[in-house]
A protein has these predicted regions:
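Conserved Class I S-adenosyl-L-methionine-dependent methyltransferase catalytic core
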Residues: 1-30
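Conserved class I S-adenosyl-L-methionine
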Residues: 35-43
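Conserved SAM-binding loop of SAM-dependent methyltransferases across substrates and taxa
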Residues: 46-57
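Conserved SAM-binding loop
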Residues: 74-75
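A short acidic, Gly/Pro-enriched loop at the edge of an enzyme's catalytic core
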Residues: 95-104
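A short glycine-rich, Lys/Arg-flanked "PGG" loop and its adjoining helix->strand segment in the class I
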Residues: 119-132
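Conserved beta-strand signature within the Rossmann-like core of class I S-adenosyl-L-methionine
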Residues: 132-140
């Protein structure tokens, strides 16, 4: 599915692919789009949500990304799926996006914004929403009591995996969207699903290591990636971290 964010498991028997669809379904259920509505995805990744939303809900979706590789892959993916007439993939920074939309989705993009720019993110989000529209954001969070210490230190992930990244806590998030006048109408936590997602990624990564190493990746990368996947799975299992889908409404 080319998806690199948490799946949502409704049962232990579900496949990773089905659980990723559950995530998309829950986002669409909260945004509640009508056919021909125009949705925006901030950080469209490799196009999984765009494809799902267009197929299942007959909506039009604009996806923005700052990655040329993702832009090109997603355009090709949606064209080959016969969905190009309802899709627009734009190489753009979210702060430069114009227009207003019937709903907005953003899946684990917020973590890369940086604390300094959180107020800009939420004010931009509000400006891009039509009155009455809803946005559903999937965001990784740090436990409230750990946030003050976390924000003062650079951890392994910030140094080696996602430089410049910063996770919020739930209370910090709430303060940010209330300041711009967005109302929280739904919040779902599913950290245990992220733990399972990461464990499945870990197994899959090692099962195809011979193929990966034949490209250009060495044993140092393998150790780093295994540590990243295993340690993150432990964070969500221990509940020191969580992942949420929060739905915000513009009144």
């Amino acid at each position: 599915s080319m998806t690199y964010s948490s799946a949502l498991f409704n049962s232990d028997k579900e496949s990773l692919e089905k659980a990723q669809e559950n995530k998309y379904y829950n986002i669409c259920k909260n945004i509640n789009p009508k056919p021909d509505d125009h949705l925006l995805e901030i950080g469209c990744g490799w196009g999984g949500f765009m494809e799902y939303a267009i197929k299942k809900y007959k909506v039009n979706v604009t996806g923005i990304t700052i990655s040329k590789a993702q832009h090109d892959f997603t355009k090709k993916r949606l064209f080959e799926a016969g969905l190009a007439d309802r899709a627009k993939v734009v190489l753009n920074d979210y702060r430069n996006q114009r227009g207003q939309f019937d709903g907005i989705a953003s899946i684990e993009m917020f973590e890369a914004v940086g604390e300094k720019y959180w107020p800009i993110y939420f004010s931009t989000l509000k400006n891009l929403m039509k009155t009455g529209a809803k946005s559903t954001l999937q965001i990784i969070t740090v436990a409230d009591e750990l946030f003050p210490k976390y924000r003062k230190n650079v951890d392994f992930i910030q140094k080696y995996i996602f430089p410049g990244g910063m996770l919020p806590s739930k209370k910090v998030l709430e303060k940010q969207f209330l300041q711009v006048g967005l109302k929280n109408v739904n919040l779902k936590s599913f950290g245990s699903s992220y733990s399972k997602t990461l464990r499945l990624w870990h197994t899959s990564f090692n099962s195809v290591w011979d193929d990966i190493s034949s490209v250009k990746f060495d044993d140092r990368f393998k150790r780093m990636w295994n540590f990243y996947l295993a340690s993150c799975a432990a964070v969500f299992h221990s509940k020191t971290g969580d992942v949420i889908q929060v739905t915000l409404k513009k009144s």
